[in-house]
Regions:
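Catalytic cores of RNA-modifying enzymes
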Residues: 1-216, 244, 255, 264, ...
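Active-site-proximal catalytic alpha-helix in oxidoreductases
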Residues: 220
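Short helix-coil junctions and helix-kink-helix linkers
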Residues: 231-233
Length: 277
């Protein structure tokens, strides 16, 4: 009996060929690519990736699926399976002695929705500590609600701290929505394919930890104005003066500022602290 999807691993296996081809087209897979696939499941996407790329490294936590994948791809030289938790795995340590599979330059994955945020941090890093070996691009099948937040624009009610942090590190675009019926079993939510292109040159936050703290505080109470949310970090009148210099209204809320404005505000606060010191 073939392995069945396990709820505890958040497994929903893609069965729609049209969506599969949209993912492959978005990833722009060519010879020369070395692909990381997270959660290959039954190998439906893996088969295509191994036919198009020079190398595919699949990370799977489910032991039963690993046994099936080893049998299925044992004759495929460009395929390597790593059994384990992607969040705990040190890819560089695991692959650095295998030049045919390292370094990896793209990610293509249908990931478990309940660990989307940790996986994004694993792949992109954080503002204060970006991935030192960024991927060329990352194509993910994720929950639609999260996808919308990733590429949301300033002024939108869903533009939040996650939007700012991810857009600081990467460009993000929606490729296509994916209905629940495209999976086995169907999830209780709608899904979407997104493409992230990590930025080769990051926005110049002088003090990245301060930037992260500022964004987190700014969005801590969405209904409040920034001058209230940030009062523990900076004097209210000083903040109003800084916002005015950035051509931002004193009544602005966190979602009103673009990523660039968040960077400039962070830098001005850092400069002010330096001058005070």
């Amino acid at each position: 009996m073939p392995p069945q999807p396990r709820k505890r691993f958040g497994q929903h296996w893609l069965k729609n060929e049209k969506v599969l081809h949209r993912i492959l087209a978005a990833a722009e897979v060519t010879k020369g690519d070395r692909i990381l696939e997270i959660g290959p499941g039954t190998g439906i996407l893996t088969r295509w990736l191994t036919s198009l790329a020079d190398a595919v490294v699949a990370v799977e936590i489910d032991r039963d699926l690993c046994q099936q994948l080893r049998r299925q791809f044992e004759a495929v030289e460009q395929f390597l399976l790593l059994e384990g938790d992607i969040l705990q795995l040190d890819l560089a340590a695991s692959l650095s002695q295998q030049p045919d599979f390292w370094p990896l330059n793209k990610v293509v994955a249908n990931i478990p929705y309940y660990i989307t945020a940790p996986i994004l941090e694993k792949l992109l890093g954080r503002v204060a500590q970006p991935n030192p070996q960024p991927f060329d691009q990352i194509v993910l099948l994720i929950q639609r609600e999260v996808a919308d937040r990733l590429y949301a624009q300033p002024g939108s009610k869903i533009f939040g701290a996650l939007s700012v942090r991810v857009q600081y590190l990467a460009g993000c675009e929606l490729i296509c929505p994916v209905p629940a019926k495209a999976f086995q079993p169907p999830p209780k939510v709608e899904s979407a394919v997104v493409r992230l292109r990590p930025r080769p040159f990051l926005p110049a936050a002088i003090n990245p930890p301060l930037f992260e703290q500022l964004v987190q505080l700014g969005f801590s109470s969405r209904r409040k104005m920034l001058r209230n949310n940030l009062q523990d970090l900076i004097d209210r009148e000083q903040l109003i003066s800084l916002l005015t210099s950035l051509k931002v209204l004193p009544t602005a809320r966190a979602e009103d500022l673009s990523v660039e404005q968040w960077v400039r505000l962070s830098n001005k606060i850092q400069e002010m602290r330096g001058n005070d010191g």
